[in-house]
Amino acid sequence: MLDPNLLRNEPDAVAEKLARRGYKLDVDTLRAHEERRKVLQVETENLQAERNSRSKSIGQAKARGEDIEPLRQEVNALGERLDAAKAELDALLTCINDFSMAIPNIPADVVPLGKDDSENQEISRWGEPRQFDFTVRDHVELGEMAAGLDFAAAVKLTGSRFIVMKGQIALMHRALSQFMLDLHTEQHGYQETYVPYLVNHASLYGTGQLPKFGEDLFHTRPLDEEASSSNYALIPTSEVPLTNLVRDEILEEETLPLKMTAHTPCFRSEAGAYGRDTRGLIRMHQFDKVEMVHITRPEDSMDALEELVGHAEKVLQLLNLPYRKVLLCTGDMGFGAQKTYDLEVWLPAQDTYREISSCSNMGDFQARRMKARCRPRGESKTRLVHTLNGSGLAVGRTLVAVLENYQQADGRIEVPEVLRPYMKGLHFIG
């Protein structure tokens, strides 16, 4: 959520910055709402003052023995007008809030201008794609040869875009998540955190999934049903519960940064992905991810983003998986992001790089929604924190990359050296 003062005082400047990401801010509606708010605010305050004055007059008239009925009727009429003005103001404030909640974040000045992913900026590459002297198999064929990926069973149990993993493939999937968690907690300074997989609507508003992206979530009740204590959604990423741990909190600045990581399943309806990546593990309704979240002082967040993406890169480097780092253009960034890097891993069967991690600085966009603040030592005044999040990594896509990059001519998979301690010392599977 953008700063309301910025929207009120500099709407044209905000509109110009948002236009860089292809968003047209309705400045006329914004101004009309603000003008009406000012009128109602003054009207409400005047009616309240007049009602208080008239109420005081009733006591004075009564003490003098005068007939107070005319004054009482006048006070009642003022009360009705005040209630009506308050109701209209409350409705308008709700409308303004809904309007503001739908506005995306302002891109950082360094973000390249562009319409879509074709205009993203490649920053660097690491590793050389392996040259195979045999016909490359994709991860689906390799997983089925190893009797470890069973898509048919998942369809029987649930439906499409789900998977049943078995045996050594399931072991490798678990090993990857354990390796990532150990790396982040032992070398990168994160606190491992276990979080709920169901969250309430307040959490989803806090990190920006609601109200705009409700159809992308799996809800325990219809989204249009009135919110209640039991109206939950499955998490689309553990960014949601991890970041919301600081909702409504005031943190002492000397405790920052906070660095948290969690391994969770993630659940997404993929409402806009019909027909895309229908084969294999690339785009699933349920997938595992190791998430990294930073809570920082405002002045530290851009440096923290570089650190965050470096931690995700380290996972790929230790697995010896070729990848490239991409700076997203304005038109390809997520709704709440100021600046985003994607890491794309090389998939031999697709002969291309595919996203495996997205790392974003959200600035104070989420913090304003969550009322997450920090306070400098010895001061009473608070300020909003900055929040960052990144995949470290998507476990299923990492499994895909390992299967395809480490495949042998006979269909077996060499186990990356760093995973062997997590896989009973196995050097090959399949």
Curated annotation (Swiss-Prot):
Key words of the record: Aminoacyl-tRNA synthetase, ATP-binding, Cytoplasm, Ligase, Nucleotide-binding, Protein biosynthesis
Instruction: Note down the stretches annotated as region Disordered.
Output: 45-65
Query: Catalytic activity annotated for this protein?
Result: tRNA(Ser) + L-serine + ATP = L-seryl-tRNA(Ser) + AMP + diphosphate + H(+); tRNA(Sec) + L-serine + ATP = L-seryl-tRNA(Sec) + AMP + diphosphate + H(+)
Q: Which PROSITE patterns match?
A: AA_TRNA_LIGASE_II
Which Pfam families does the protein's record reference?
A: Seryl_tRNA_N (PF02403), tRNA-synt_2b (PF00587)
Pathway-wise, it operates in: Aminoacyl-tRNA biosynthesis; selenocysteinyl-tRNA(Sec) biosynthesis; L-seryl-tRNA(Sec) from L-serine and tRNA(Sec): step 1/1
| Single GO BP term | selenocysteine biosynthetic process
- EC nos: 6.1.1.11
Q: Which SUPFAM superfamilies match?
A: Class II aaRS and biotin synthetases (SSF55681), tRNA-binding arm (SSF46589)
Positions annotated to bind ATP: R268, S269, E270, E355, I356, S357, S358
| Entry function | Catalyzes the attachment of serine to tRNA(Ser). Is also able to aminoacylate tRNA(Sec) with serine, to form the misacylated tRNA L-seryl-tRNA(Sec), which will be further converted into selenocysteinyl-tRNA(Sec).
Record's comment describing the protein's domains = Consists of two distinct domains, a catalytic core and a N-terminal extension that is involved in tRNA binding.
Q: Which NCBIfam families match?
A: serS
Q: Which family does the UniProt entry place this protein in?
A: Belongs to the class-II aminoacyl-tRNA synthetase family. Type-1 seryl-tRNA synthetase subfamily.
Q: Which PANTHER family match?
A: SERINE--TRNA LIGASE, SERYL-TRNA SYNTHETASE
Q: What is this protein called?
A: Serine--tRNA ligase
Which species does the entry assign this protein to? Erwinia tasmaniensis (strain DSM 17950 / CFBP 7177 / CIP 109463 / NCPPB 4357 / Et1/99)
